[in-house]
Amino acid sequence: MKKSNLHHIRNIGIIAHIDAGKTTVTERILYYTGRSHKIGEVHDGEAIMDWMADEQERGITITSAVTTCQWKENEIQLIDTPGHVDFTMEVERSLRVLDGAVGVFCAVGGVEPQSETVWHQADKYHVPKLAFINKLDRIGADFFGTVEMIRQRLHAVPLILQLPVGAEDHFSGIIDLLTMKQYKWNDDTLGATFSMDDIHADDIDKAEEYREKLIETVAEADDDIMDAYLSETPISPQSLVEGIRRATISLKLVPILCGSALKNKGIQPLLDAISWFLPSPEDIPPIKGVHPETNESIECLPKERDPLAALIFKVSMIEGRKLSFVRVYSGTLKSGSEVFNPARNQKEKLSRILRMHANKRERIDSAGPGSIVGVVGLKASSTGETLCSPDHPVLLEKMEFYEPVISVAIEPKTHTDQEKLEQVLDKFLAEDPTLTVRTDDDTGQTILSGMGELHLEIIISRMEREFGTHVNVGKPQVVYRESIENEIEATAVFDKEVAGQNHFGEVSLRLKPLARGTGNLFKSQLASETIPAVYIPVIEKGVMESLESGTLMGYPVVDVEATLTGGSYRESAGTELAYKVSASMACKDALSKGHPYLLDPIMNVEVTVPESFMGEVIGDLSSRSGKIESISPHVGTQVIKATVPLARMFGYSTSLRSATQGRGTFTMRFSHFDRS
């Protein structure tokens, strides 16, 4: 593969709802760019990017896979992301490091719930996007209906660049509104070759109508095209492409393309659109960080000779070894070099740098700005942390991770499994920041918590497949949160001899409830001489660790402000241990007296049903303490949006099948914690 300069790099992700055809689009991209020499089909369990055994068995993407391919003069670094709601965090951390994205939409299903979620995640990171309307060969395909859903549900301004020729079984190609040519793919070459012909006479009026709409839409978003349009100056295809590029990168427009990946139609023009309209690392604003000590703002420019600034966005355990996935923003990563992690105030040494192709790896000596690579040798660093030059420290913004909402109790089946379990779980925790593990104080069982039942199923399956660790698994349980109703004060004293040394600490705290979603806060109102300042961080640590397990049922405590109001110090016996323990004791005492209560995980539920079953479905949701948010029509069905406590959703799929004679479907994703 020839070396690309920065201008010719495209870092993109493929994002979509499950079953929109995202991985099939990716497999065709790999085939037509020459990165693979055989088309891998998802339904055959042969997709290159779905390399894990669980992905191949289930026919879904579970983990984001990275690869690099060449299209004409451009190098495309591509991440294929999961579509299932349980793996939303995989999408989130990929979008953090991408410069552009392709949203894949099923022409039958349109904009589905997880499509909305990942699209808005991309909006959060200001990622320019294209939309590819897939599966136009399917019965019920509706190109214009899907475009309208993109406008309405995603609050985007769609720019139609292509029109489908035919529909469903008669879908035969596309009309390109930029070149005003009709594309037809050769089935004998698996779509590798295609013809560009004049538009059929029956379609020319429609094509001219939509080309005029295209120019008007671009003119509204780009001043240069508007000036040419108003002065009636002819707009060349190149000028139009440049205007669309500017409007796409500035997030004003979303170019719309179409095809059928399974039928090998529409992928080459999509690759052209990625090259023409999505940004290079030079086209996006420089990422900003701060100096870890002075908090001074630092701008990281995409220049090879500048100091290093890179972000670890993912960690994987492959063949028992830790592989860190890194996006380089500034400077150059070099194999064998020393880097600095400012979050841990620690230096690390890179042993190898790898260019990734799914689970295959190619060693390279260095990686410059815009590169997305795998790194071996980082021992302490984890997901969301910065790597920088030791003599030019910079701290990039950390990633935010979602809270787990469901848990299972696991027990090792044999003594051998018991010995391996802790080590295996440590590997998964390093890899997956949405996974948590704790020990139940009453039963001694290990409690594994994650984003959903499928998420936990995959973890347990991987324990057995990859590490030979077998466990008994309990029924899924809801992961609640705790908070308090009342403001309360408490004082605790730790005064003991430990290992021949006297330890003394007295701490007084005031706990008060905060608004939902605020998080936990700590502050000190101590008079300066009451307790030496050196012990304040230790007291804060004791409080925050205490809030990790509430007094009601042992769930994490949220939305509480802890204020250090008093205490005392004994010069001969004041120790960090004493103040940490007394802070924890005071916090626990205040929690128990503050009228603690449980918070339920509340889920956004979207149910799609034939209209004749609406009444029964709404009644069932209401009986589960659900609140109906909206009801809207969609392709011969009704879409019901509601919020429902997760605890009331167990067994819902069976109930829905029964109520709708198997014709209803639903999706569910976490919304927030609240009292139900």
Question: What do the PLM-derived regions correspond to, one by one?
Answer:
Residues 1-676:
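Structural and coupling elements of P-loop NTPases
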